[in-house]
Amino acid sequence: MAEKQTAKRNRREEILQSLALMLESSDGSQRITTAKLAASVGVSEAALYRHFPSKTRMFDSLIEFIEDSLITRINLILKDEKDTSARLRLIVLLILGFGERNPGLTRILTGHALMFEQDRLQGRINQLFERIEAQLRQVLREKRMREGEGYATDENLLASQLLAFCEGMLSRFVRSEFKYRPTDDFDARWPLIAAQLQ
């Protein structure tokens, strides 16, 4: 019984990895059908549906992976790092680095891969970005408690500016067909971003 569960989990992972790879390829710039995905995995469409009730559920699973990866790592940064500027830098670099290492998933983060899918999937991505923005806002607000002084600029504005930078770099990555990596020149860009944190 345990072997059967492991085999089923492995097949599910194989399907999700194939979907992510298709999103990374030129196929990702078009609607991905279950027929194309089944051919990529080397199974029938019926076999796909034995593991996932719908393509939407496949995207749900990829979004869960994105959420778990980013939120878990953000929480680790907040636990390990106490300096506000370092926290913000690490969170921004985490988001950009995750996108760079996972180009297919970046198409999901930017909404590009979800254009032809159910609206609620885009809603989940919107919620993820709202959670990240709330985390950034909290880090900015905690500066006053941790370091004795806050920012002159409203923390809401600063948090949205940081997130807009991340979203812009991820969109540029997708638009360029993954030519312009989000972390390129980050060490030169960060001082420009940090200068806005007044």
Swiss-Prot record:
Belongs to the nucleoid occlusion factor SlmA family. GO terms for molecular function: DNA-binding transcription factor activity; transcription cis-regulatory region binding. One of its GO terms (biological process) is cell division. Transmembrane segments: none annotated. Its main location: cytoplasm. Keywords: Cell cycle, Cell division, Coiled coil, Cytoplasm, DNA-binding. It is found in: Cytoplasm, Nucleoid. Gene3D superfamilies: Tetracycline Repressor, domain 2. Residues 117-144 form a coiled coil. It comes from the Bacteria. This is Nucleoid occlusion factor SlmA. NCBIfam families: PRK09480.1. GO terms for cellular component: bacterial nucleoid; cytoplasm. Residues 10-70 form the HTH tetR-type domain. Required for nucleoid occlusion (NO) phenomenon, which prevents Z-ring formation and cell division over the nucleoid. Acts as a DNA-associated cell division inhibitor that binds simultaneously chromosomal DNA and FtsZ, and disrupts the assembly of FtsZ polymers. SlmA-DNA-binding sequences (SBS) are dispersed on non-Ter regions of the chromosome, preventing FtsZ polymerization at these regions. Homodimer. Interacts with FtsZ. PANTHER family: HTH-TYPE TRANSCRIPTIONAL REGULATOR RUTR, NUCLEOID OCCLUSION FACTOR SLMA. Residues 33-52 bind DNA.
